[in-house]
């Protein structure tokens, strides 16, 4: 059983090798090499893409941290001012100038507009409106027992506001706006008549209304953005503000206004070393504020669909990146600003950068390697194909007689032995026909060897056309042929032999110009049915002996037994 299994495995391998062939194996090898080279290149592309994304995030993080530090500085100043205001409300300074300011307030509080100023060089003036105007506002009120303390606290905060406000800061204006009808601002009010307009401009802003106890229950710092009206000459601003409370009473709002243009200038300064990519600042509602590219302010602005896609991505993380068409968009939420900083990197910018150069080089290398691989495949494939054709031709020549195109003696014996063994295994008959052309030497002597060759070729064609599909014929001598008939009984083999004899004898063939001859053959037939012997050489010897009996009996005959 083990021997049979081993033989079956070897037979299966041989069939597979014949089915595939050298050309298919070459194709398979080159496909595997191309596949692995493509996978390695793809892996390098993935690593390169990860490095590119990390680089984009690092650039964005550096700018975001720098912007956050400046904004944090302003928020810290705002918290410091609120703490100072609270202390001043609880324990005001007992200065004569401050008491005089309270007295002056009592004298002018009924006036339409008023201004209290201690020392213009050291502190900021308090600008206010009348009691009547205050009573008209829903959020405004002077029904406060600590109103005098708030007046003095506002003057003290005015001193701190003057110190905190400087030209190097991003803040354009710092102010305290009270619910009691007055305000202190680093931007002076030149004419008293403008105080009511300016005050009501403050108290109607979202950054003031948004700090009511209902709107801002946690009393935290909040950011607001203001977009200019179409008919207004004012520019967009970002305002950070915080409510001022003491003893559960809301006094007013401290705020700082930052023009969007200063943020734009900061972004431009922050990316001087990184020329590629555009930085964009958005508020918490993803409304565009400013860009680091003033020359093309709307070049990379997102449409509503892209903004919705970006907002959906931002819901899951405070930082990240996505691809939009030919752009890579990375974002990071700021810690001290209620908004997000976005970096847009286009495909053209990426191609011009270091990663673009590496990507192009990698693509060219892969294309060059693939081209060389295909050329090598073509050359080797042609070489193997030619060698395979040559091998097949040499093998055919080694197994066949070139004149008759039948098997030669050695090949016939190689074919006969396994066929005889197979028939013996399955108990099928195995027959042999031996054929010899009559008077062939006389034809050679009379008409020449070329005529003899034509006779042999003609006879071989007639013999082949008389056989069954499973029969095998070969040339075993000069004018001798042998036919193997696996599975044919002696009677069937004799019928085949008779058919061969008739075909050979019936047809005339042209030997020379106007010269035709008719050939004949003597045939001997043997079969394993007679003795049970499946030895091919013994059967051939028996058929050969009967062939000579046919010649002795007058030629052009078939002898299938010794007694016929």
From Swiss-Prot:
InterPro entries per record: CHASE7 (IPR033416), Diguanylate_Cyclase (IPR050469), GGDEF_dom (IPR000160), Nucleotide_cyclase (IPR029787), Rev_trsase/Diguanyl_cyclase (IPR043128)
Transmembrane in keyword set: yes
Pathway(s) served: Glycan metabolism; bacterial cellulose biosynthesis; Purine metabolism; 3',5'-cyclic di-GMP biosynthesis
Pfam families: CHASE7, GGDEF
Stretches that traverse the bilayer: 20-40, 360-380
UniProt site positions, description: Transition state stabilizer: 441
Phosphoprotein among keywords: no
Locations listed in the record: Cell inner membrane
EC number(s) reported in the record: 2.7.7.65
Active site feature: 479
UniProt cofactor(s): Mg(2+)
Cofactor note: Binds 1 Mg(2+) ion per monomer.
Binding site for Mg(2+): 436, 479
Record's bilayer topology term: Multi-pass membrane protein
Top EC class, one word: transferase
An example Gene Ontology molecular-function term: metal ion binding
GO cellular component labels: plasma membrane
GO biological process, one term: cellulose biosynthetic process
Catalytic activity: 2 GTP = 3',3'-c-di-GMP + 2 diphosphate
Domain GGDEF: residue ranges: 428-563
Binding site for substrate: 444, 449, 453
Keywords assigned: Cell inner membrane, Cell membrane, Cellulose biosynthesis, GTP-binding, Magnesium, Membrane, Metal-binding, Nucleotide-binding, Transferase, Transmembrane, Transmembrane helix
Assembly notes: Homodimer.
Its biological purpose: Catalyzes the synthesis of cyclic-di-GMP (c-di-GMP) via the condensation of 2 GTP molecules. Cyclic-di-GMP is a second messenger which controls cell surface-associated traits in bacteria. Involved in the regulation of cellulose production.
Protein name: Probable diguanylate cyclase DgcQ
Organism: Shigella dysenteriae serotype 1 (strain Sd197)
Gene, per the UniProt record: dgcQ
């Amino acid at each position: 059983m083990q021997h049979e299994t081993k033989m079956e495995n070897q037979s299966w391998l041989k069939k597979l090798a014949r089915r595939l062939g050298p050309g298919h194996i070459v194709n398979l090898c080159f496909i595997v090499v191309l596949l692995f080279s493509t996978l390695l290149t793809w892996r390098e592309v993935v690593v390169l893409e990860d490095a590119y994304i990390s680089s984009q995030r690092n650039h964005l993080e550096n700018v975001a941290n720098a912007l956050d530090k400046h904004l944090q500085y302003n928020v810290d100043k705002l918290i410091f001012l609120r703490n100072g205001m609270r202390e001043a409300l609880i324990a005001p300074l007992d200065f004569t100038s401050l008491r005089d300011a309270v007295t002056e307030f009592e004298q002018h509080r009924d006036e339409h507009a008023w201004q209290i100023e201690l020392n213009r060089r050291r502190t900021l003036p308090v600008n206010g409106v009348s009691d009547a105007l205050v009573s008209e506002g829903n959020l405004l009120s002077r029904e406060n027992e600590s109103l005098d303390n708030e007046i003095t606290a506002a003057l003290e905060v005015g001193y701190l506001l003057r110190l905190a406000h400087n030209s190097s800061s991003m803040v354009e204006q710092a102010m305290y706006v009270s619910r009691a009808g007055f305000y202190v601002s680093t931007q002076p009010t030149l004419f008293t008549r403008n105080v009511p307009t300016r005050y009501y401009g403050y108290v109607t802003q979202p950054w003031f209304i948004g700090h009511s106890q209902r709107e801002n229950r946690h009393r935290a710092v909040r950011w607001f953005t203001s977009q200019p009206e179409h008919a207004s000459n004012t520019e967009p601003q970002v305002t950070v503000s915080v409510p001022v409370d003491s003893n559960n009473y809301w006094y007013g709002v401290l705020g700082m206004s930052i023009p969007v243009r200063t943020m734009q200038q900061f972004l431009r300064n922050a990316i001087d070393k990184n020329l590629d990519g555009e930085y964009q600042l958005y508020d918490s509602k993803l409304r565009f504020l400013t860009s680091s590219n003033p020359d093309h302010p709307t070049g990379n602005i997102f449409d509503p669909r892209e903004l919705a896609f970006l907002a959906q991505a931002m819901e899951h993380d405070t930082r990240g990146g996505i691809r939009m068409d030919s752009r890579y968009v990375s974002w990071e939420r700021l810690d001290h600003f209620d908004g997000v900083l976005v970096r847009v990197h286009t495909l053209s910018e990426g191609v011009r950068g270091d990663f673009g150069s590496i990507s192009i080089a990698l693509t060219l290398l892969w294309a060059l390697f693939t081209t060389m691989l295909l050329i090598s495949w073509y050359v080797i494939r042609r070489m193997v194909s030619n060698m395979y054709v040559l091998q097949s031709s040499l093998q055919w020549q080694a197994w066949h007689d070139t004149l008759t195109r039948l098997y030669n003696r050695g090949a016939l014996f190689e074919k006969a032995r396994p066929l005889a063994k197979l028939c013996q295994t399955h108990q099928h008959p195995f027959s042999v026909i031996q054929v010899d052309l009559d008077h062939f030497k006389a034809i050679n002597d009379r008409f020449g060897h070329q005529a003899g060759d034509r006779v042999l070729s003609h006879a071989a064609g007639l013999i082949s056309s008389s056989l069954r599909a499973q029969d095998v014929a070969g040339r075993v001598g000069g004018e001798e042929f042998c036919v193997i008939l696996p599975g044919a009984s002696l009677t069937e083999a004799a019928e085949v032999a008779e058919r061969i004899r008739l075909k050979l004898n019936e047809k005339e063939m042209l030997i020379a110009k106007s010269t035709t001859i008719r050939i004949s053959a003597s045939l001997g037939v043997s079969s394993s049915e007679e003795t049970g012997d499946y030895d091919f050489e013994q059967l051939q010897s028996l058929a050969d002996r009967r062939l000579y009996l046919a010649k002795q009996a007058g030629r052009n005959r078939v002898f299938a037994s010794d007694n016929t």
